[in-house]
A protein has these predicted regions:
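Conserved acidic carboxylate
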Residues: 8, 82
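Two-component/phosphorelay signaling modules centered on CheY-like receiver
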Residues: 11-29
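Acidic, metal-coordinating helix/loop segments flanking the phosphotransfer/catalytic sites
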Residues: 30-48
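Acidic catalytic/metal-coordinating carboxylates
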Residues: 33, 59-62
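Short amphipathic alpha-helix used as the core "switch/output" element in two-component signaling
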Residues: 39, 61-74
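Active-site residues of response regulator receiver
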Residues: 52
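The feature encodes the CheY-like receiver
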Residues: 56
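Alpha4 helix (beta4-alpha4-beta5 surface) of REC/receiver domains from two-component response regulators
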Residues: 62, 84-100, 107-110
Length: 116
């Protein structure tokens, strides 16, 4: 079973994504509100990090860059999400994929499947 670490601050999106991912057979871990994303990802070693670009207390692109600079941080596939079209910026900082919100479930699943 593939594991997904979810870094998203919108609780409605957390609930929706968790339900969709579990229905598709993924094991989901949701980031705690005060958790250090990079530290948590390196500790839990998920197959995929699904991370929002704009969170209340942090910038997903900065977290992505920090993850990629950390030892072992390049082993995790990262799919970034945002309501803003910042795909190029995400890819330049090491994301494996980007999905623009709002998105259909099948679009999400196709992106996740493409990550292996």
């Amino acid at each position: 079973m593939k594991t997904v670490f979810l870094a998203e601050d919108d609780m409605t999106m957390v609930g929706l994504l968790t339900t969709l991912l579990k229905m598709e057979g993924y094991q989901v871990t949701v980031m705690g509100r005060d958790a250090d994303i990079v530290e948590s990802v390196l500790k839990t070693k998920p197959d995929i990090l699904l991370m929002d670009v704009r969170m209340i207390d942090r910038n997903g692109i900065e977290e992505l860059a920090r993850l990629r600079k950390s030892p072992g941080g390049d082993a995790v596939h990262v799919l970034m999400t945002s309501g803003l079209d910042v795909k190029e910026q995400c890819l330049e900082n090491g994301a494996n994929g980007f999905i623009l919100k709002p998105f259909m479930p099948e679009e999400l699943f196709n992106c996740l499947r493409s990550m292996g």
